[in-house]
Amino acid sequence: MLDLTYETPKPKVIAGAREDWELVIGLEVHAQVATNAKLFSGASTLFGAEPNSNVAFVDAGMPGMLPVINEECVAQAVRTGLGLKAAINLTSAFDRKNYFYPDLPQGYQISQLYHPIVGEGEVLVELGDGTARVVRIERIHLEQDAGKSIHDMDPHMSFVDLNRTGVALMEIVSRPDIRGPEEAAAYVSKLRQIMRYLGTCDGNMQNGNLRADVNVSVCRPGDYEKYQASQDFSHLGTRCEIKNMNSLRFIQQAIEYEARRQIAIIEDGGSVTQETRLYDPDKGETRSMRSKEEAHDYRYFPDPDLLPLEIEQAWVDDIAAALPELPDAKKARFITEFGLSDYDASVLTADTTNAAYFEAVAGEAGDGKLAANWVINELFGRLKKEDHDITESPVSPAQLAGIIKLIKADAISGKIAKDLFEIVYTEGGDPAEIVEARGMKQVTDTGAIEAAVDEIIAANPAQVAKAQENPKLAGWFVGQVMKATGGKANPKAVNQIVAAKLAQQ
């Protein structure tokens, strides 16, 4: 763990009609593995292809077709495990999860129930208010995705697209450590950030590449502590699972609704039924899908077509040695190396491209704090207005660093720098050359500034008298000098000269 000090957030407390209740949440996150081919076939994983165009015989469940494991899928699972500080199991095995669904042509899903490839790990989830929680990871296992059933193309029939069938998924299972809707969303967001840094999952929830099954239960204050002491899950209440959540906002909304639904049932004298539910974002409610299955309902058994998966420690060590710097480590380095605030470091490390852009600017400009200020406030602010991200920035790191270097050299003022940024953003060009060509260079000649100050003081004796009674009114003279020089006068020099001249009156 990083040596960072955070307070643990308090659990979400929901007031029922009769008493207070606390939330308990665990998540099963399904992350599509970033590979070009599927888990057990060479078929493409390209999103958006023509329906049923990325389907190998083994994906379609054709008789006699045997699965052959994709080594890169295994490597990506190992990378993810290492990124989550998890134990890597050198021996794992695949099992068949048997159930019928039209978009599952094999009649079973190949998964890892008994011997997953990754064991226990953890992830630090920061909530932005100075609090953070360490969420324990129970396991990560590899499994096949199912296809897609399409019900809205024809009123009389459904269609099946098998392009997604057999695509590799990592199922990341957390312990019931999450205590509120915001924590749940922050946890999924942090997992996505880590996997994007690792390059193991692109995290695009809108494409279904990252989905979460959310387990929700409620308990009375004090019961969670009993669970922690005994590891007896009965203290946590009966959980319901909300399937296939693909939006951070919907995850929070679904948890809020489901918790209140369960509280109402219990306080009315009923009992919560363990079941699988779906969230309807249009109605803002969850609805029953089916009774919650247990492992024995799926008749798991070892897949006879696949030998146990055995990997070598040396191979794992090679993967570990090649891991990139991860978000927590990068954030800590930005704070110490560049003197950034916790907030600024969090914003800049939210994405690898943001972090790389900032480092390039800071390195060339030689000023991390100034670089962070310009990247976050000016560049990100402007990009957000146009709904663009950093990869679409018309201002290169070298150009932004050039603007910052002109500020540091007192060649331009902060106001002129913003005008210059706008020119570079819309028209491009070298900042130094633009300043020279357009006469934007800051006036640093104290003689010229003194002359302007003398002229304004002489023309405004009444204002001078007011400023002598109230020194704060000296700012009026500063503004008049800046206006007279077209904003080109050095603000620091203007302030000093105005103060000195007024003192002499």
Curated annotation (Swiss-Prot):
This is Aspartyl/glutamyl-tRNA(Asn/Gln) amidotransferase subunit B. The keyword ATP-binding applies. Signal peptide: none annotated. Gene3D superfamilies: 1.10.10.410, GatB domain, N-terminal subdomain. Its EC number is 6.3.5.-. Belongs to the GatB/GatE family. GatB subfamily. One of its GO terms (molecular function) is ATP binding. It comes from the Bacteria. The keyword Repeat does not apply. One of its GO terms (biological process) is glutaminyl-tRNAGln biosynthesis via transamidation. It comes from Dinoroseobacter shibae (strain DSM 16493 / NCIMB 14021 / DFL 12). Heterotrimer of A, B and C subunits. Keywords: ATP-binding, Ligase, Nucleotide-binding, Protein biosynthesis. Transmembrane segments: none annotated. InterPro entries: Asn/Gln-tRNA_amidoTrfase_suB/E, Asn/Gln-tRNA_Trfase_suB/E_cat, Asn/Gln_amidotransferase, Asn/Gln_tRNA_amidoTrase-B-like, GatB, GatB_C_1, GatB_Yqey_C_2, Gln-tRNA_amidoTrfase_suB_CS. It is an enzyme of class 6 (ligase). Allows the formation of correctly charged Asn-tRNA(Asn) or Gln-tRNA(Gln) through the transamidation of misacylated Asp-tRNA(Asn) or Glu-tRNA(Gln) in organisms which lack either or both of asparaginyl-tRNA or glutaminyl-tRNA synthetases. The reaction takes place in the presence of glutamine and ATP through an activated phospho-Asp-tRNA(Asn) or phospho-Glu-tRNA(Gln). It catalyses: L-glutamyl-tRNA(Gln) + L-glutamine + ATP + H2O = L-glutaminyl-tRNA(Gln) + L-glutamate + ADP + phosphate + H(+); L-aspartyl-tRNA(Asn) + L-glutamine + ATP + H2O = L-asparaginyl-tRNA(Asn) + L-glutamate + ADP + phosphate + 2 H(+). SMART domains: GatB_Yqey (SM00845). The gene is gatB.
